[in-house]
Amino acid sequence: SFDSFLGSGAGTYYGTSGGVTLSVLKCLYYFRTGNDLSNNEVLVKDKEFYKEYRLKIGRNVIRCASVSTMSNLLKVLLIKDEFDFIEVMNCEGGCIFGGGQVVLPTNKKDEIIKARALALKKNMRKGNSFPYKNPLVSELCDKYGDELVDVLHN
């Protein structure tokens, strides 16, 4: 049988650098507070070669970075102790400009990456943007429990 088309908006946004980080922060916030995270609770700053995310939960500040390309990763590794979590995407901007995408003019690369990221962000808003509310994931967790750790994307 085929995979279900049922998914979450959060999964859609995984195609961009920072999508995994936002999903992790949403889950962490929910499991620590019992509440859904609103976007205005995450402070996002564009840095020279990465994005920085900060989220306060109680007295704790969770510090994250998302980085794309290996050359930028090498720079982030020099300051890795500043972060609790680092997301790494090999392709510039994430999968949206990766090897599986149609080859486009490189002189418009930044414009294309931004447009593709915006399209995914809009698509994310249409569906459920909270990974822990995905009914398919809940069903799998109920059925297989700890066995999933070895087979799911992590």
Please place each PLM-identified region on the residue numbering.
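Iron-sulfur (Fe-S) cluster-binding modules
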Residues: 1-154
